[in-house]
Amino acid sequence: MLLKIKAFFLWLTTPLQKFLQQVGNQEALMTSDQVDRCIQLIEPGDILLSYESGRPTSVFIKGYYDHAALVTAKKSVIEAVGDYYIKNPRGTKKNFGGVRQVDLEAWLFKKDSVCIIRPVYDLDKHKVDHNKIASRSVFFYEGLGYDYTFKFGNETIYCSELVYASYKKNDSMFMHHIPENKEILPNDYYTACFESKRSDMFFQIIYEARNG
């Protein structure tokens, strides 16, 4: 019942979320040294968490980090955002946000804080490279619309769900410690570095730059 009430509230506030996504722009805090360090360390399949103090929509998201994205096989970033942007790759006339590919360096410079998280798999137990597979699978979702209701299983997708879906395609146990009836938030990937109990993989913080 509580989940239905929450879903209804998020649906009800969708116009407000869309408006807030467009306002709230202020100068980001990531430095050139921090961005260079990130670029040196980042690998395909890495999960990027970020925080932007100028995002009023952050009030809808629990935890410090308010956004999650995935590093692609091309070393670009694919993310699901609520911002308006030009030309939906799937050809709809009007785009109210969704999944897009952006340049890694440009993405980093827009942030106040960034955390790089890497799912590390035991290669003796896994015969495939899940990180590389996820970094390719994520392209399947490019052009999908943004999910303002934060619900699994519909035709739209939100930021941390995009990361989840890209890994879940080939790793059925990915983020299995999160209850199925709970939405996955950006900060869940951060806490997974300390709370995940799997014996065949773990989540590792590769680098973190907190400026706000």
What are these regions (language model features)?
Residues F109-K182:
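Active-site nucleophile-His-acid catalytic modules used for acyl/amide transfer and hydrolysis
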Residues I47-Y121, L144-I157:
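Glycine-rich catalytic cores of cysteine/serine-nucleophile enzymes that process amide/ester linkages
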Residues S32, R37, N131-A134, A192:
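Charged, low-complexity, helix-prone segments enriched in Lys/Glu/Asp/Gln
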Residues P15, L41, R136-F140, A192:
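Residues that form generic nucleotide/phosphate-binding pockets
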